Design a protein with these regions (language model features):
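Charged/polar positions on well-ordered alpha helices
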Residues: 21-22, 64, 146
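N-terminal strand-loop-strand
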Residues: 2-47
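Residue-level marker of positions within ordered structural domains that often coincide
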Residues: 25, 106, 149
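A short, polar/proline- and glycine-enriched secondary-structure boundary/capping micro-motif
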Residues: 42-46, 121-124, 145
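C-terminal alpha-helix
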Residues: 146-154
């Protein structure tokens, strides 16, 4: 029986994040992914992302989050689009939109030491062709395929 059928509903809370795939500056077709511990204690490889702060626009938030979670400085190449999903958090239903960008590394080095929330436990470079086998979430795997398609057209 659904919540609606039972006469109960949880408040739906909209949430926005921005992040993306950062191409390595060495010219290889590798992107930086962060590792987060899942509930089972295993590492899930994910696209770095987070919430805009203050007056930040989506692009600024994505660049800042990349720096915090990966240690990399980056510039945006192209907007890859958005993904939408919902999940439960306590008594709320979070309705999340994540804005993804393809970026190019302009400086920095891989480290999770700058992540203020300490969500990332690892960061590594991964070959773009292996993203389908690496990324933990299907919606991010779809975005990874979009990166491959975009690069193939260039």
């Amino acid at each position: 029986m659904s919540e609606r059928q039972r006469g109960t509903t949880r408040p739906r809370v909209p949430e926005t994040s921005a992040g993306g795939f950062v191409l390595c500056s060495d010219g290889s077709l590798r992107v930086a992914l962060i590792g987060r511990l899942n509930r089972g204690g295993r590492i899930d490889w994910c696209v770095p992302k987070g919430h805009p702060e203050g007056d930040e626009n989506l692009e600024q938030a994505a660049i800042r989050e990349i720096a915090e979670e990966t240690g990399l400085e980056a510039e945006i190449i192209v907007n890859l689009g958005d993904i939408h999903y919902e999940f439960s958090a306590g008594n709320k239903l979070i309705s999340k939109t994540v804005h993804h960008f393809l970026m190019r590394q302009t400086g920095g080095h891989l480290t999770v030491e700058n992540d203020p929330q300490r969500e990332a436990v690892d960061v590594q470079w991964f070959e773009i062709e292996n993203l389908d086998n690496t990324l933990a979430h299907e919606n991010e795997r779809r975005m990874g395929r979009g990166v491959q398609e975009w690069l193939a057209r260039q």
